Amino acid sequence: MKAKYLILDVDGTLTDGKIYMGESGELFKAFDIKDGCGIHDIFPSHGGKVIVITARESKIVENRCKELKIEMFYQGVRDKAKKLHELAELFSLEKNGCGEYLNVAYMGDDIIDIPIMKLCEHRGAPKNASREVLKEATFISSRNGGDGAVREFIEHLCGISV
């Protein structure tokens, strides 16, 4: 197993990045079932813990995290790197010579994710992530965000051949 902790962005990573709005203003997001299986079953069965950090706030995200048994999810966080430093203290994480937290993986898709990505030993990106994020990634999924990219990253981290 390459990482003990997997931190995930939501919009554009766990979803396709689109927000669907109903007539009454209700928001909808779609999540991939394969990503859910990777988060709920595969990664924890290999001894890993999944954490969600997202800049937006949504009851939808809270519901999905609860459904997948993600105990640590943080919404409305614009400075994700700062949140990682807080988590590093909580979990007593160590850094390598490059200043990256050991045994920590992050997957994100847009420029807001770059500062936290640079702090993680393993950095994943969906195929359709922004150009800048793709440059920082150590793993680029063959799948788009919201279409199994997270599952593919989890399989990579767990050493599962696909």
Predicted stretch roles:
Residues 28-29, 67, 81-162:
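Mg2+-dependent phosphoryl-transfer enzymes with acidic/Ser/Thr/Gly-rich catalytic loops
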